[in-house]
Amino acid sequence: MPQPQQHTADYSSAAYEAQLQQKLIRLNQDFASFNLPEISVFRSPEKHFRMRTEFRIWHERGTAMYVMFSQTDKRPYPIREFPIGSERINQLMPELMALVNRHECLRHKLFQVEFLTSLSNQALITLVYHKPLDEEWISAATDLRKQLNVEIIGRSRKQKILLERDHIIECLKVNGREYRYQQVEGSFTQPNARVCEQMLSWAQEQTRHTGGDLLELYCGNGNFTLPLAQNFDRVLATEISKTSVDSALYNSRLNQVENLQIARMSSEEFTQAMDGVREFNRLKHISLNDYRFSTIFVDPPRAGLDPATCHLAQRFDNIVYISCNPETLKDNLQTLTQTHQICTFAAFDQFPYTHHLECGVLLQRR
């Protein structure tokens, strides 16, 4: 393996603040035409903020090691510590690799390792292989699970071996109340738990005195749904992923949220249902006419809202928009501000030391 140059990433308070200020300068420049109110800024911990990550595995002289690949020449370099990873990830990394290297059946053709951890100190490790997994592997992985006190999943082509659970439980504090979430292996979860808590608290505050009913699109595992539900009479949420819908229903029961209904459908399909263009069997148990929606909450993928969903949002008095891509947010705001005004704007440093910045916007009808 080529010997990489010594990586001397700076995770000091000064370095963190410098990178954040650069992102905020760019954000203000990009949104200058909207005459934004003062931006509320929510900072991340400087280290140990990332709750999930994955590493490729490099094999050399009978030893496996974690590697990443240089962005310049694509060469692998070993990862011996991971300061942005959670403390639990950093604890597990050397312990796991030491045990893997002691057992040929665990090490042989191991291709990738994925970590999922929580603030409640739970952990799930997925081991991905380029070989079929057999009874010998199951026996060794079962011992590994007990020694590390983690959940273990084995994956290879057309094969998934679940030893016990395929999820962990995360506990997030939102304005003084604790919410528990099932986080399933392979499904989307917010990577920065401390910033996620701030995002949930912010969204809850924006809707505290709104009342009426809430429509949420792209609800995922109910991440925002559960804290928001206490501010509304009823909540109707949509999500396309079956795994996420199942988790959202599980999480609503776990947190005793009883004013929520979930429909498994895309935002485009829901728009057709609202307009009476199509009828959906998945909505047979829901009477849309019974809802008195005051607010729509959207947390779309990086592509942002499609034009039809943008126009759907304009029908609501209040729009709460969480964006993981300021570029598509800017495009959507060109449409939304034709009928609504921006009341509050927030920046969440979900991904420190990258150019990414998460945003939150509250818009109200003019």
UniProtKB/Swiss-Prot annotation:
GO terms for molecular function: rRNA binding; tRNA (uracil(54)-C5)-methyltransferase activity, S-adenosyl methionine-dependent; tRNA binding. GO terms for cellular component: cytosol. Pfam families: tRNA_U5-meth_tr. S-adenosyl-L-methionine binds at Q190, Y218, N223, E239, D299. The keyword Zinc does not apply. The active site is at C324 (nucleophile), E358 (proton acceptor). PROSITE patterns: SAM_MT_RNA_M5U (PS51687), TRMA_1 (PS01230), TRMA_2 (PS01231). Its EC number is 2.1.1.-, 2.1.1.35. Keywords: Methyltransferase, S-adenosyl-L-methionine, Transferase, tRNA processing. Belongs to the class I-like SAM-binding methyltransferase superfamily. RNA M5U methyltransferase family. TrmA subfamily. Dual-specificity methyltransferase that catalyzes the formation of 5-methyluridine at position 54 (m5U54) in all tRNAs, and that of position 341 (m5U341) in tmRNA (transfer-mRNA). This is tRNA/tmRNA (uracil-C(5))-methyltransferase.
